[in-house]
């Protein structure tokens, strides 16, 4: 597989993306803090059937940082403009987490550009304000991100996470934090300004560390104060006309912190009520499903592509939605 990294200026903002394969267009949008490389386990097989574009969202990876200008609608408009300027044909859009919300926004607001949507464990309804602040553990996690980054080693040494069935938060294991922190500092000293890529780490941890080392923390800051949350989730889901698959990963509720995960069953049921032809797949997998279950993920994309073949595009309505500023 020949994979090329390229840059494109989208609405005045430079975006990095990777491109491979030939066939119907397929765009991959990673979740918050993750670079396009998070799709490396599925890219080779997808590129056998599709012309694949894996995009670094603004503020992520090698894409330009735009502090003070992070909203779901801006990121959604970035994707629409990328589809128009770079892809040049209607595409299947697959997004993980916040990337799933971005793909849904694009499908709702530019129906002529999106053939189908695979929303991989997006925070549907839980990433609306004030629910994100009041009913999700991830808001506490985001506050920790803002307080500790760019001290990447310090981030892990003070990280605490909830565990299903336990009230008390579990600290990141100190011996692991010590070893990881030392490796991060050595890498930063040897390669100042470069992504922190520690190859002996498990792949998901390695990508998380790398992503955070390139990440504009202001993207997360916008999630702590609600300025990110300008998307009406119900309205967007209801306006998606193309085929859509929603993957729900594992989640649970903590008695004091609320939802731990992207969606609960009530959120999924609400999405299904808004879009009756929605295909829902519930997987007992962690949040980044394409890393945890790459073969099953590719199969889900291929099944969605079959449904997309039979979909007749509806042209954009005459009243276009307002464009988000760059």
Task: Show which residues each predicted segment covers.
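Catalytic histidine-centered segment of alpha/beta-hydrolase-like enzymes
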Residues: 285-294
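Active-site loop/oxyanion-hole signature of alpha/beta-hydrolase fold enzymes
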Residues: 40, 54-94, 98, 136
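Flexible "cap/lid" loop of the alpha/beta hydrolase fold
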Residues: 118-167
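Conserved hydrolase catalytic core segment
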Residues: 51, 89-133
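Conserved serine/cysteine hydrolase catalytic core
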Residues: 193-274
